[in-house]
């Protein structure tokens, strides 16, 4: 469904992503983990066309989301054309990114009305279904400032789902939350996985990675160190010292 082919990214001459190849199948949950500064979030932003790679290509269902071909040459898509791909690849950020001056319901119907060109009544009905799905139908008239971080993130997930994406990207969706609020967001994400939503998740929540991930991709210094199913990645037989060090650090920090 999604293929990253020899993706590279440089900032100010420094290469932060080094020829990364990843494929994601329909219905798969791929969890990307690694130390801070390893390139995880940059990778997600490139999948959503918020950052342009310095090299390589990204294919969604066999079609490039970066370039179009004309007369045998590749040309970048316009910003308007890129916006169409972004409706197919939803993204949930760690900072929620809700419109502060709009109610919960207004936040969710904004995209469907203005991008999907839905009628307002139909968008509202869909939004209510999604709010019930994330357990927040009773908050439809509330404003973001009155909600907890966990509630705001669940609204952000509902807003992303309202665009009917083919897959969802999560960029450390629980890292900005108080520990007691993390669980409510992870429950929503687990339910999406059970429903077959294709997801790429950057997270430090190892319990989620172990339980829900179909594959764990460990990135360090812009390079994929390992791409393996969780039963191998977390097993004591995994001999990769860099991964052991990373997991041990997480364990110590959690104490």
PLM regions and their residue ranges:
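Conserved ABC ATPase signature
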Residues: 143-147, 151
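C-terminal boundary and immediately downstream tail of ABC-type ATPase nucleotide-binding domains
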Residues: 231-255
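A short, surface-exposed alpha-helical micro-motif characterized by mixed small hydrophobic
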Residues: 209-211
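Conserved ABC transporter NBD signature motif
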Residues: 56-70
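Catalytic Walker B motif of ABC-type/P-loop ATPase nucleotide-binding domains
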Residues: 168-171
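A short, proline-enriched helix->beta-strand linker immediately N-terminal to the Walker B motif
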Residues: 162-166
């Amino acid at each position: 469904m999604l293929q990253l082919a020899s993706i590279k990214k440089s900032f100010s001459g420094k290469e932060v992503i080094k020829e990364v190849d990843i494929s994601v199948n329909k219905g798969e949950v791929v969890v990307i983990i690694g130390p801070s500064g390893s390139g995880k979030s940059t990778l997600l932003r490139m999948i959503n066309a918020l950052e342009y790679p310095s090299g390589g290509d990204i294919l969604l269902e066999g079609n490039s989301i970066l370039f179009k071909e004309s007369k045998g040459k590749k040309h970048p898509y316009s910003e308007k054309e890129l916006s169409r791909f972004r409706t197919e690849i939803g993204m949930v950020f760690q900072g929620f990114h809700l419109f502060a001056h709009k109610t919960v319901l207004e936040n969710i119907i904004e995209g469907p009305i203005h991008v999907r060109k839905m009628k307002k009544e139909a968008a509202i009905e869909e939004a209510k279904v999604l709010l019930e799905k994330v357990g927040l139908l009773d908050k439809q008239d509330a404003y973001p400032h009155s909600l907890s971080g966990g509630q705001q993130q669940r609204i952000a997930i509902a807003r992303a789902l309202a665009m009917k994406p083919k897959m969802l990207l999560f960029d450390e969706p629980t890292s900005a939350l108080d520990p007691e609020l993390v669980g409510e967001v992870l429950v929503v994400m687990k339910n999406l996985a059970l429903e077959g939503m294709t997801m790429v998740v950057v997270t430090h929540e190892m319990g989620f990675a172990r339980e829900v991930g179909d594959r764990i991709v460990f990135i360090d210094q812009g390079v994929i160190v390992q791409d393996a199913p969780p039963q191998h990645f977390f097993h004591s037989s995994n001999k990769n010292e860099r991964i052991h060090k990373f997991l041990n650090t997480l364990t110590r920090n959690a104490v």
